[in-house]
Amino acid sequence: MKFSAGAVLSWSSLLLASSVFAQQEAVAPEDSAVVKLATDSFNEYIQSHDLVLAEFFAPWCGHCKNMAPEYVKAAETLVEKNITLAQIDCTENQDLCMEHNIPGFPSLKIFKNSDVNNSIDYEGPRTAEAIVQFMIKQSQPAVAVVADLPAYLANETFVTPVIVQSGKIDADFNATFYSMANKHFNDYDFVSAENADDDFKLSIYLPSAMDEPVVYNGKKADIADADVFEKWLQVEALPYFGEIDGSVFAQYVESGLPLGYLFYNDEEELEEYKPLFTELAKKNRGLMNFVSIDARKFGRHAGNLNMKEQFPLFAIHDMTEDLKYGLPQLSEEAFDELSDKIVLESKAIESLVKDFLKGDASPIVKSQEIFENQDSSVFQLVGKNHDEIVNDPKKDVLVLYYAPWCGHCKRLAPTYQELADTYANATSDVLIAKLDHTENDVRGVVIEGYPTIVLYPGGKKSESVVYQGSRSLDSLFDFIKENGHFDVDGKALYEEAQEKAAEEADADAELADEEDAIHDEL
């Protein structure tokens, strides 16, 4: 996203907008540049204008009131550029707001090319400057066509990566380039600088390193494929060593690469380590990403990486396998007694990265201690013995992965206990187990929610099977019989147990009757 001098708010517009808000309200003043739309005027207005930002609001909404002065300021600036900011009061136009699926207030939607049926949600900062910058971006073409690329890059200010095609451009790649530009309109700036005398080049200029463009060095025929282009962008358009927070986390996940975290205490400490991590990131580009994370704001995230909150720290998360790696840390006692700040050794960081990429590093496995006493027929697994137990070729092992707070897990517990009792009292071929996933890491198991139930059939080459059925006793019996290696009929065992229990109850009743009769005779 680029901004020119014309996008900067003028002092006059700032003063004008602020003067009309002596008492702050959600509704823009009548003499402002904000257009009021209603159900009977909305469609016609959108269809007759190329670009409109519409605020769906409620007069009582506190967030709407807070944003109102900024919205008016932005409208005063953008009206000169033929960009309209509008308001729709949802308390008076409920059907219109329902039609556009307004989830809450304020909701800001961008309508482009007079299209009333398709809109883009504005999710940026609710300040006049941010709104102006974003809307000016929306008014520009998806691809900036320039004759003098160096001059263009030097004279503009960019806050998102700049994707540039230059030199001799063929039709196939050009179509892909424009398609990607439209898809990622708000993510990157796309620039085309065609010159038939030069060789084709595809480059990415990162805002933090405009003098070091990343150049695509593969085959042009490959990158003309949109999927290949997308994957290349996901990796190369990320900064070498950038700051991570909730707004950019998804981009790192989508890259599919492991993520190295530097947790830092303050900006001075960050600057101390920045050269090292920038160099590591350049050296290992395409293999893993590196980010800094402010421990003052996101220190608890260290726990998600199986690390203690002892900062600074360095850890690696292999998100594909959900494995975590980190430099050794102090005991709690040693950390409490520490008088000097922790220093991360460059060689230790480099060594961990090298070993991780070679597959030689050992992950940090979170695990409870192995339960010495199993006082239930449901076997309690932990991270340390999970693989050993589930890979036992002499048993079909059913595992319930749960969280203690999970309501569905709690409701399943009596049924699961009855399931375990049935097998435990009749056969050693089936083991019913459970694992608290909040306290134990497991490898190779995709757990997207709780409860997750997985069967590990016995035998030497059996594949695990995820249970997808209802959480009834009969369904679980059927699942184990149909997918287990030993073909154990749980229903039959259950019926036998019920019959045996009934016989024992009858025998007990007869014995009681006999004792009563003897007592009466006496």
Curated annotation (Swiss-Prot):
Keywords: Disulfide bond, Endoplasmic reticulum, Glycoprotein, Isomerase, Redox-active center, Repeat, Signal
E.C. no: 5.3.4.1
Record region (Disordered): 497-522
Active site residues per record: 61, 64, 406, 409
Gene Ontology biological process terms from the UniProt entry: positive regulation of endoplasmic reticulum unfolded protein response; protein folding; response to endoplasmic reticulum stress
Pfam families per the UniProt record, alphabetical: Thioredoxin, Thioredoxin_6
Residues spanning the signal sequence: 1-28
Marked site (Lowers pKa of C-terminal Cys of second active site) residue numbers: 471
CDD domains: PDI_a_family, PDI_a_PDI_a'_C, PDI_b'_family, PDI_b_family
GO cellular component terms listed in the entry, alphabetical order: endoplasmic reticulum; endoplasmic reticulum lumen; mannosyl-oligosaccharide 1,2-alpha-mannosidase complex
Disulfide bonds: 61-64, 406-409
Family matches, as InterPro entries: Prot_disulphide_isomerase (IPR005792), Thioredoxin-like_sf (IPR036249), Thioredoxin_CS (IPR017937), Thioredoxin_domain (IPR013766)
PTM annotation, UniProt: The N-terminus is blocked.
Main EC class the enzyme belongs to: isomerase
Annotated motif Prevents secretion from ER, positions: 519-522
Residues glycosylated per entry: 82, 117, 155, 174, 425
Superkingdom of origin organism: Eukaryota
Subcellular location: Endoplasmic reticulum lumen
NCBIfam families: ER_PDI_fam
Family: Belongs to the protein disulfide isomerase family.
Function description: Protein disulfide isomerase of ER lumen required for formation of disulfide bonds in secretory and cell-surface proteins and which unscrambles non-native disulfide bonds. Forms a complex with MNL1 to process unfolded protein-bound Man8GlcNAc2 oligosaccharides to Man7GlcNAc2, promoting degradation in unfolded protein response.
The protein's name: Protein disulfide-isomerase
Record organism: Saccharomyces cerevisiae (strain ATCC 204508 / S288c)
Gene from which the chain derives: PDI1
